[in-house]
């Protein structure tokens, strides 16, 4: 009889936390839209991508580490090798790979493209959750079929953005080409330039390379969310999770920059680059990752990832105003399919959550945990009571 008691005792608090998490994630995506535009300005000046990432990460770590140490020193669990390995992979995927691939992709595209492909993150997160066993799909029900169909539609939209750009609907296409060519000659660390040259020799265009890197950026972010959610159950200090992830990511970024950045002048930043680093380090890194980790603990990675579609509108609007970036037909069509697939998955998830919550109210001992990652915090705790049991075999055990 404990399930109803848990719901009654903490339901209002869980709902309040969930509302705050949803609001926080909306602001995170708004801040990300501004980050796309501000970073593009820095790339236009010719900042080295690795130098930018190193400065950003060091600034973010200098904020997150003291906050985590003083605020959570009483709730941190003892460290072990398994936790250290998890934090390393979080830093590798969510900080190192995520940031570097995004900047390379943004260099060869524009903020509109960078934001338009972000809605694929929820689908990649869903696929990883299925492979990890934290998300289950029943293909005999309409919800499961819609999830799979929405996943395929979203992936199709992402692929479409890679293979087709089309005419510029708004803005000057030639100006965009000239801007990308100018950027590619400045601020490129040698191995990155060599890698880009290799793709160009294979017949790829610069925008192909850019979109492929942006897809890799989305896959890294999905991996970060999928790994972080179960880790937060074992290590509930969310600020410390963000700080430790940034520690390993910063170590990887600094090590890479040490070997790849050859020119001492690359470490000298202009005023606009310094402002971009401050925004990236304080807002897009420390604040956003802190809010993201806390929200992931409250509402789970699937719902956290579902807020990424807010980025395209904000980024396209801001980049069109401040940068004059063109909007291409490929980004519009591909973005439409990405968002269509996203909301197919969202609708199916909502239906399953509604059914599961209704089942709790009618027969609490028959609770099914088909989607533990997208319940609210209270339902997540209920799901943990039955961890290790298949959902179909959960019975009353008074």
UniProtKB/Swiss-Prot annotation:
Asked if the keyword Membrane belongs to this entry, the reply reads: yes
Q: Which domain of life is it from?
A: Eukaryota
**Pfam families this protein is in?**
EamA
Bilayer topology:
Multi-pass membrane protein
For this UniProt entry, what's an example GO CC term? Golgi apparatus
Question: What keywords is this UniProt entry annotated with?
Answer: Membrane, Repeat, Transmembrane, Transmembrane helix
Under what name is this protein listed?
WAT1-related protein At4g19185
